[in-house]
């Protein structure tokens, strides 16, 4: 979040990013991350 502001970007609501498990027995690894855009971005 702060890192995004240092670059002069705009921060948006968090987005859930999921990565498949390394094994068939594992669950999906999901974590919330800030969705950031560069300064001057339309979204």
From Swiss-Prot:
The keyword Secreted applies. Its main location: secreted. Disulfide bonds join 4-36, 11-30, 18-37. SUPFAM superfamilies: Defensin-like (SSF57392). Pfam families: Myotoxins. PROSITE patterns: MYOTOXINS_1, MYOTOXINS_2. Keywords: Antimicrobial, Disulfide bond, Ion channel impairing toxin, Myotoxin, Neurotoxin, Potassium channel impairing toxin, Secreted, Toxin, Voltage-gated potassium channel impairing toxin. One of its GO terms (biological process) is envenomation resulting in occlusion of the pore of voltage-gated potassium channel in another organism. GO terms for cellular component: extracellular region. Expressed by the venom gland. It is found in: Secreted. One of its GO terms (molecular function) is toxin activity. Belongs to the crotamine-myotoxin family. Monomer. Cationic peptide that possesses multiple functions. It acts as a cell-penetrating peptide (CPP), and as a potent voltage-gated potassium channel (Kv) inhibitor. It exhibits antimicrobial activities, hind limb paralysis, and severe muscle necrosis by a non-enzymatic mechanism. This is Myotoxin-2.
């Amino acid at each position: 979040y702060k890192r995004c502001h240092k670059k002069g970007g705009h921060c948006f609501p968090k987005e859930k990013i999921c990565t498949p498990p390394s094994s068939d027995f594992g669950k999906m690894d999901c974590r919330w991350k800030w969705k950031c855009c560069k300064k001057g971005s339309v979204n």
